[in-house]
């Protein structure tokens, strides 16, 4: 894996990859274990393309990857990294933010965490740039016949992303695994809530798993447990507690 990274301004994703050669090791193994040649992967909030490139290499020429990233600087590096790794043919990269509506939105930029841009204002002083908003379900409807893994990491707009994708997911022959970030405070700032996201995901009737990236394991959970956790986080003002969760069948690590 060869990646063109952000400069020292980015204290998170690029810095970690520069220092350790990997980003989110357990999530990386989850993505790779969920994909095989011919599979289809959708990366929502693709950043500079770390997971996109890994997935494209995994699914090969017979598979497909769709990567959505609204920030122009991240998107430039995403495209550069596709070319650098020779996987541009199997990736459709789209400079847009997925949402539950079409049109134009604002992306509020973080100066030191270039993976923490948000499509809502949380009251901080941030530069705002216009970005296209796209309904994921409508965009992908005629482009995919199957979907194996969906990764959503959008700094609080996960509910709107999933709302826009639900018509597609419900119409597929098989519901994909979904790897998604759950940050109740960010979801609230974006006009939703952690509980609302969990209840929406539960309509897919798939198992829930907590991604334990410390012990590198999946911990079985439930709609009720995760909704309760969200309520507990909401009860503490300013609590930015978060976790990644997996929705779908258990992953077989080989």
PLM regions and their residue ranges:
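Hydrophobic packing residues within well-ordered alpha-helices of enzyme cores
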Residues: 55, 78, 91, 107, ...
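Conserved acidic-Pro-Pro-aromatic motif
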Residues: 138-253
């Amino acid at each position: 894996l060869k990646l063109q990274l952000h400069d020292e301004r980015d204290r998170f994703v690029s810095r970690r990859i520069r220092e350790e050669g990997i980003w989110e090791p357990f999530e990386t193994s989850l993505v790779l274990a969920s994909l095989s040649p011919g599979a289809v992967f959708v990366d929502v909030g693709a950043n500079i393309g770390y997971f996109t490139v890994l997935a494209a290499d995994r699914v090969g020429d017979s598979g497909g990857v769709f990567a959505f990233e609204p920030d122009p600087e991240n998107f430039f590096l995403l495209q550069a990294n596709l070319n650098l790794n020779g996987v541009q043919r199997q990736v459709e990269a789209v400079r847009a933010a997925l949402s539950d509506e079409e049109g134009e939105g604002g992306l509020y930029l973080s100066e030191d965490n270039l993976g923490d841009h948000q499509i809502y204002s949380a009251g901080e002083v941030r530069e705002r740039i216009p970005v296209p908003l796209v309904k994921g379900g409508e965009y992908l409807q005629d482009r995919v016949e199957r979907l194996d893994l969906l990764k959503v990491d959008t700094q609080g707009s996960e509910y709107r992303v999933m709302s826009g994708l639900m018509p597609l997911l419900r119409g597929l022959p098989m519901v994909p695994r979904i790897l998604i970030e759950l940050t109740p405070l960010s979801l609230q700032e974006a006009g939703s809530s952690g509980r609302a996201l969990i209840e929406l995901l539960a309509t897919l009737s798939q198992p829930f798993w907590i991604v334990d990236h410390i012990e590198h394991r999946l911990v079985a959970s439930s709609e009720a447990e995760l909704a309760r956790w969200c309520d507990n986080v909401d009860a503490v003002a300013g609590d930015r507690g978060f976790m990644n969760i997996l929705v779908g069948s258990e992953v077989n690590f080989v």
